[in-house]
Amino acid sequence: NGTASGFESEVTGGFNKLANKYNFIALYPESVNFYDGDTLVNTFNDIIRETTNEEISSICLSDSERYVYPKYPNCDRGRCGWAPCADDANFVKLLIDHFKDNYKIRNVYMIGNSSGGTFVNSYVCKYPESITSAISINGMSRLGFGCTPNQPVNFITYASLNDTSVPPIGGISADGLFYETQESLIKTWVDKFECKEKVSKTYKHFETFNENLFSECLGGIKIVSILNLDSDHMWPEAGYDKETGLSSYTNYGTCVTDIQDEFKIPKCYRTNDRWGSEFILKKLFEFDNVN
């Protein structure tokens, strides 16, 4: 439940500075929000295909076995639903169209983290023509809601092995929600676009990463899966402690800067090394050599 300014400042280590460095426009969309007591609830509607309350009610543990999230007012998404009813995908599509109409835009890259990453998985299926490449970070699709787009688009799924919030392997999160696995997500993409080549490698910065690159796919796209072998539910290397050499979870981004001072939550005061953000950007920019 982070904010746009929390994402820009704390999670990414100052993403605007990278926008200036690489000469791109950075947009930070947010969905609707509300307060549950003193807690700001702010997340994306990641289930954007047609569904029913009964279907959504089947993708979590019983209420006695899970964390029951507060629900948006006047929005019933079923027993296991906790996202808003707003059409966030259409909102983001309209934003992209606006900037394409008013600026000379060559490429559109979509990045989402956590529930934002889950939203990215869904968005690329609904509006693939609107973007060049997308990366979903620590955001698996809810069980039964995995999808592939009807036309080729470059795609990266990034996950963390020790993530219990949105687990890439086990499928059941610590709060009792059911998710697709990273393996099943990437397989549906690779099968759909008939990728013929696969290159696997393991590399290390501070944390260790396993990467699979699928190429010679329909439309000339590339599909990538990256699994961080050391990290929890974190932006790349955001949880790494250089003194101990260990990675752990830190709650970044549930804060605001002065540009969002209307929210009654703590001000942002921490920042990450921007290595992880530049790592993500370079992965997206590598696709430019394909199209």
Regions found by a protein language model. Give the residues of each.
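Serine-hydrolase catalytic machinery in alpha/beta-hydrolase-like enzymes
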Residues: 1-109, 122, 126, 237-248
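Primarily recognizes the serine-hydrolase "nucleophile elbow" in alpha/beta-hydrolase
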Residues: 5, 100-153, 164
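A structural signal for well-ordered alpha-helical segments within the folded catalytic domains
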Residues: 13, 86-93, 117-121, 129, ...
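Surface-exposed acidic, glycine-flexible loop patches that form ligand/cofactor-binding
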Residues: 15-18, 98-106, 125-126, 143-149, ...
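Short beta-to-alpha linker loops that shape the active-site pocket of alpha/beta-hydrolase fold enzymes
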Residues: 30-34, 140, 231
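Alpha/beta-hydrolase-fold serine-hydrolase catalytic core, especially in secreted/extracellular enzymes
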Residues: 75, 153, 190-291
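Second-shell loop/turn segments in exported
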Residues: 78-83, 175-176, 266-267
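The feature captures the conserved acid-bearing segment of alpha/beta-hydrolase catalytic domains
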Residues: 132-219, 227-230
